[in-house]
Each structure stands twice: as C-alpha cells, then as structure tokens.
Amino acid sequence: MADGPDEYDTETGCVPLLHPEEIKPQSHYNHGYGEPLGRKTHVDDYSTWDIVKATQYGIYERCRELVEAGYDVRQPDKENVTLLHWAAINNRIDLVKYYISKGAIVDQLGGDLNSTPLHWATRQGHLSMVVQLMKYGADPSLIDGEGCSCIHLAAQFGHTSIVAYLIAKGQDVDMMDQNGMTPLMWAAYRTHSVDPTRLLLTFNVSVNLGDKYHKNTALHWAVLAGNTTVISLLLEAGGNVDAQNVKGESALDLAKQRKNVWMINHLQEARQAKGYDNPSFLRKLKADKEFRQKVMLGTPFLVIWLVGFIADLNIDSWLIKGLMYGGVWATVQFLSKSFFDHSMHSALPLGIYLATKFWMYVTWFFWFWNDLSFLSIHLPFLANSVALFYNFGKSWKSDPGIIKATEEQKKKTIVELAETGSLDLSIFCSTCLIRKPVRSKHCGVCNRCIAKFDHHCPWVGNCVGAGNHRYFMGYLFFLLFMICWMIYGCVSYWGLHCETTYTKDGFWTYITQIATCSPWMFWMFLNSVFHFMWVAVLLMCQMYQITCLGITTNERMNARRYKHFKVTTTSIESPFNHGCVRNIIDFFEFRCCGLFRPVIVDWTRQYTIEYDQISGSGYQLV
C-alpha cells in the first residue's frame, strides 16, 4: 500500500477508487447507453433484430419469437452477458418474467465484473426490477467481481429505496464487503446527500466501525470525500471524532491535511461539545447532557433578572452600571461556549418564555397585589393563569401526533410499498421509516414525523400537530390576556407611584419619568409589549388559517409541493376547507350538547384526502 492519502484512490478491488463523475460509469453495465433504453415509439422492422437488441429495447414479441425458435435464454453473448442481465438493467420486467419461465438462471454471473442481474438492476436504481428478481429467488448477498453485494452498490449509488428494501428483506445493515467496507462507509464516501446515510443511521447502523484495511470509520471516509452533509449526520449520530485509522489519523487530522476550514471547525466543535478541550472540572459538567439543558434553560432567568436588577440599583454612575452589564455579557459568553450545544435553538426560546413569565408573576404578586382590586382584577387574572398553565403544559408535554411504528411494522411497510411500486421518498420518511400520512411532515428539530404538522414552536419546546394544536391555540389565547393584564398592572403602578407630567410635557418626557421612577417595572413593561406583539400576530394568523383557509402553517408555506392543493398567485384552495363555521367546529371539536357533530380524523393513519373512511382510520361522524 502507498503511504500517502492518495492511496485511497489507487487501491484495487471494491475499495473507494472511483471519482465522483464515475458514479454512473459508462461501462459494461450499460453497454454504451447513457440511460436505460426506452421502448421504440415509431414503427420499425424488428424482424432483423438480434435477441440482445430486442431485449434492450423491450421488444417482447421479437424476443419470444427467437426463444420459441430455439434460442437458449441461458446463453451469454460474446461479452459474457445473459439476456436476463440486459432485461434487468433496462427494467424490462415482462421479459424477465418470460426468460425465467423459460429457464433463465436468476443468479447467473456475467459481464466484466462477474455480476448477477440483480447487481445490474441495483446499480441502475431499478427498485421494481430488484423486487421482481428477489421474488424469483435472486440472492442480494452474492458479491460481484469487486467484492460488493447489492446493498453496498445501492449505498454507493445513492439508491435509498433499494437500500431500505434490502434491509427490510433481511440484509445486515453492517454487512461488510470483501474489503471490509460497510454500506454506511460507502454512502459516506460516495453519496453527497442526506440519504441513504440518514436511512442507515435510522436502522441503528454501527457508526464507529472501521474498514478492514485502513481502519477508517464512516466519518473518515466522509472527510476524505469532503462530504459535509454526511459529516453533520454522523456527528449527530455519535460519530467518534477521535477514532484513529491504521496510521493513527483521526477524522480531524484528515480534515487538516485537506485544509478544509468547514470540516475542521465542525469537527473541533464536536470535540468541544464532548468536553475534550476543556479543563477537567468543566469536562465532567460538559458531558452531562441534563446539566447542559438546565444551564440553557436557566440562563434567561439569570439574564432577565440581572438586566432589571442592575437598572434598578440606586447608583448614579452609568459607568459602573455599564461595567456590570459587561460582566453579564461575559458570563453569558462563558456559559454559551462552555455548555450550550446544538439544542440551544429549542431550549433558549423555551427558557426565555419561562423566565419572562416567572418574573412577570413575581412582579404581579410583589408589586401589584396591594394596588389592584381582588375581585375585579386578581381573581380573573388567577383564573386566566390556571387556564394558561394548563394549555401551556399540554402544548409542551403532550404528544403532538408522533407517528409511531415498531421495527417489524417499519420493515413490513417498506416491503409493501416497494412491492406495490409506491416506495417513493415523497410519501416515505427515510428517518422514521414509515409511510407518511397526508398532512404529516418530518420535523427536523424533533426528528419525528408529526401528524397534521403545523410548525415546531420553540416557545413551547414542542411540535404543534394533531395531538396538541387545540391546546396551543388555548395557550396563545390565555397568554395574550395575561400579557394585557400585565401591561394594565404596569400602567396602574405608574399612576399610583410615579409623578408624571404626560399632559404637560408629552410622551417622551413621560417615558423618561416612568423609566426613572421604576426601571424594573419599565423593563417588565418592555418584555410585555414584545411578547404581546408576537403572540397577537401568531394568534391572528392561526385563526385565519384554521377558520378561513382550512390549512396548517406548513401547508400554507409549502402548498405548491402538495398535489392536493390548488395554488394561484392570490389564493390557496384546500380540500380540507369546509367553510368557516364547519372548520371551527371540526378543529375545536365543538358539540354543544349534541347541537354540532364535528368530524373527527385520526391523522396518524389518514393517507388520502377522501372523507368516506371507516371509523378509526379516517373521517368519522360523532
């Protein structure tokens, strides 16, 4: 073996050696045809065609004529390729059935790479042909002349549906080829997209296995290929940044050799996330996921309090206060670099919401309690708060409509979809390994498929879907009233405790006076106004979509992607829109002592837009 990095491009056999442009090689597999040959659409004289050409073009009658005249279907041509190979690579299912009925050997080896027809079909990505050949007993575990089985070829060429089908039919997700390469390693090296790597990871593939010769992990191979998409997936799945190959090189070392700044930064961040580059006492805390989560949730509590507390201090020197604010900023920077991880995008907004409401309630009970009427103000405020806490808790912790399936159900679904010609990534989720119901979507934040997906809300730390959308609407409604009461409390406090001259000196003088009178109260007021704006806008948008359009936020944003929506430049026509009144009754499931009969849908199992579904799997009148 060579000593330098270039050895990875000079190894023989089924070791990564092809350049990216050779992934679809113009080789013996397609016999010079750039794409699988289509059927002839014009009248032609097929009577002079030999059986190989007729097979390539799918001329069934000519092929049958020659076979009936005595041609041996097992006989290879001058290039050692059988008719079954040519039918397989050009996806001629009817001819495959015919040739096998006439005695063709389904696993006969042929061609320069000594491959089976199943290998040829796999390389070209013909899932329907793979299914058909395996129905006739083709063995996907057989290796070709390069030492690869079908799952390795499918992973190399990015045929995700075929990878899924082969695994569902029993192929080992960690199967090694003759050179010790797993499907994950091939996908990491050859396929610069999320799939099939994401699919393999979902099947609990061994992320940190090393290949037979170089001892490179999938992360090593992704770095060698500059596959940034897959690098991110592997790191999220627990890829070991410090794993070393036979030369003692880590993935980070290889990235530095290639001087790829993006890869170097991300691999170093992965090390830091595990606490490897921190002092020992910080490393232990950094490695504690629960502690990191508490820090991310708790930081907003500290920051909101310190901002108001420093402003409220009876200190005339703004220099001192400025230095104190600088200390707050430095503390936040330290915490963020030491303990914040990729989950901060969901943890921080939730922490900000919880912290804001906590300090608002502290302000209400310690500043407003003695100034406001109990019956007319405090009692309604407390009742509203109970409803707010209930709906927030349900929005935060309840199941938003996660589509669940057992391992066996997932594999069964894959096989059923493949064998019916429906294993399309537009209706199949390669992460959750389920058939996606209508109106569902895979949430990239939660990494789950959600029924009737609306959006992922960072303010409640959860997706909003079929299971909690009504609670989310209740949360917005009662939150808006809570904020209005808070603003009312601030204004009342200023009227009772602050000397103001609004009518005499105008608005800006009034702002200065109330900010000086109680900086803490002014800080709470600013928070209230900020939250009022986004809550009011979100509530109005949600109500408009629910009542007038009959669609979710996801559907409104991506309507052009869904065939069942009719989209113009000015409107979206939804098959789920039944008029404002009907939409409201169905969404909130209003019954009013039997006056209304809402239509209840199990969106986790609804795969079509038709409404005449039986109870438990579709629309149901109550």
UniProtKB/Swiss-Prot annotation:
A Gene Ontology MF term for this entry? protein-cysteine S-stearoyltransferase activity
Q: Where is the DHHC domain?
A: 427-477
According to its record, what are the GO cellular component terms?
Answer: cell projection; glutamatergic synapse; Golgi apparatus; Golgi membrane; Golgi-associated vesicle membrane; perforant pathway to dendrate granule cell synapse; postsynaptic Golgi apparatus; presynaptic membrane
Q: How is it modified after translation?
A: Autopalmitoylated. Autopalmitoylation has a regulatory role in ZDHHC17-mediated Mg(2+) transport.
State the UniProt keywords alphabetically. Answer: Acyltransferase, ANK repeat, Cell membrane, Cell projection, Cytoplasmic vesicle, Golgi apparatus, Lipoprotein, Membrane, Palmitate, Repeat, Synapse, Transferase, Transmembrane, Transmembrane helix
Q: What SMART domains does the annotation carry?
A: ANK
Catalytic machinery residues:
457 (s-palmitoyl cysteine intermediate)
Give the reactions, separated by semicolons, that this protein catalyses.
L-cysteinyl-[protein] + hexadecanoyl-CoA = S-hexadecanoyl-L-cysteinyl-[protein] + CoA; L-cysteinyl-[protein] + tetradecanoyl-CoA = S-tetradecanoyl-L-cysteinyl-[protein] + CoA; L-cysteinyl-[protein] + octadecanoyl-CoA = S-octadecanoyl-L-cysteinyl-[protein] + CoA
Top-level class of the enzyme under EC nomenclature: transferase
The entry's localization annotation reads:
Golgi apparatus membrane; Cytoplasmic vesicle membrane; Presynaptic cell membrane
Q: Does the keyword Cytoplasm apply?
A: no
Q: What is its EC number?
A: 2.3.1.225, 2.3.1.-
Report any one BP term from Gene Ontology: lipoprotein transport
Query: According to Swiss-Prot or TrEMBL, what is its membrane topology?
Result: Multi-pass membrane protein
Is Chloroplast one of the keywords? no
Q: Anything noted about its domains?
A: The DHHC domain is required for palmitoyltransferase activity.
PANTHER family noted in UniProt: ANK_REP_REGION DOMAIN-CONTAINING PROTEIN-RELATED (PTHR24161), PALMITOYLTRANSFERASE ZDHHC17 (PTHR24161:SF18)
**The family this protein is said to belong to:** Belongs to the DHHC palmitoyltransferase family. AKR/ZDHHC17 subfamily.
- Assembly with partners or alone: Interacts (via ANK repeats) with numerous proteins (via the consensus sequence motif [VIAP]-[VIT]-x-x-Q-P). Interacts (via ANK repeats) with CLIP3. Interacts (via ANK repeats) with HTT. Interacts (via ANK repeats) with DNAJC5 (via C-terminus). Interacts (via ANK repeats) with MAP6. Interacts (via ANK repeats) with SNAP23. Interacts (via ANK repeats) with SNAP25. Interacts (via ANK repeats) with EVL. Interacts with SPRED1 and SPRED3. Interacts with GPM6A and OPTN. May interact (via ANK repeats) with SPRED2. May interact with NTRK1; may regulate its localization and function.
Q: What does this protein do?
A: Palmitoyltransferase that catalyzes the addition of palmitate onto various protein substrates and is involved in a variety of cellular processes. Has no stringent fatty acid selectivity and in addition to palmitate can also transfer onto target proteins myristate from tetradecanoyl-CoA and stearate from octadecanoyl-CoA. Palmitoyltransferase specific for a subset of neuronal proteins, including SNAP25, DLG4/PSD95, GAD2, SYT1 and HTT. Also palmitoylates neuronal protein GPM6A as well as SPRED1 and SPRED3.
Q: What is this protein called?
A: Palmitoyltransferase ZDHHC17
